[in-house]
Amino acid sequence: GNTAGTLFSGYPEKVEIKEERGYRIADIQAVSGTILLDQKKSNRVFQKKVQTYMGIASTVTADTEHSACILPGSDMRTGGTLIQYQETDWRFLKRMASQLGLPLVPDTSYYYPRFYLGLPEGEKRELGEIISCDLCFDGRYYAVSGKCLVDREDFICYDVVTRTSLSLGDRVTYEGRELLVSRKKTELAGGEVIFTYRLAGNSY
């Protein structure tokens, strides 16, 4: 049967009420709690070579109540100077994460400004019935293939549509490969909730 669960927790940014066939429909645009880190610009200098990326993230978010940065993998030293100049905390953290080749992923199960530095460590899950699937290829393969030994198959990914609710970082088996849920899109279509996932290998 159907199960209840939270699809998104955050803050309403825009609300529009409209009437359609005698029904009143609310169109709500919401943003995650990390919006609280994207309000004001700050200036900071981090110049100790022994400092770590998580240490910097903790310093940057310290003034924002209930904020938390979660690192699924191993922490690393920066080995150099990082400067935040006239940037919001969120923009600076995104730029810092890009140096590690990692995304910043908001935790949308809370309305607090919680986020992951890299994809969260998910669970082994089942896709369930697949409505449709499109194959895609990550063009970054051509940028790195000449610099190191990489498997072209690791850069093949799938956009899968299903009714099963998964979380970013969850692992599924598809086409004989164990893949990660690296993107998630939720839609209400024909009165039911539909999910589109980008399934990719560890190199994505």
Residue ranges and their predicted role:
Residues 1-204:
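Amphipathic alpha-helical and helix-coil boundary elements used as assembly
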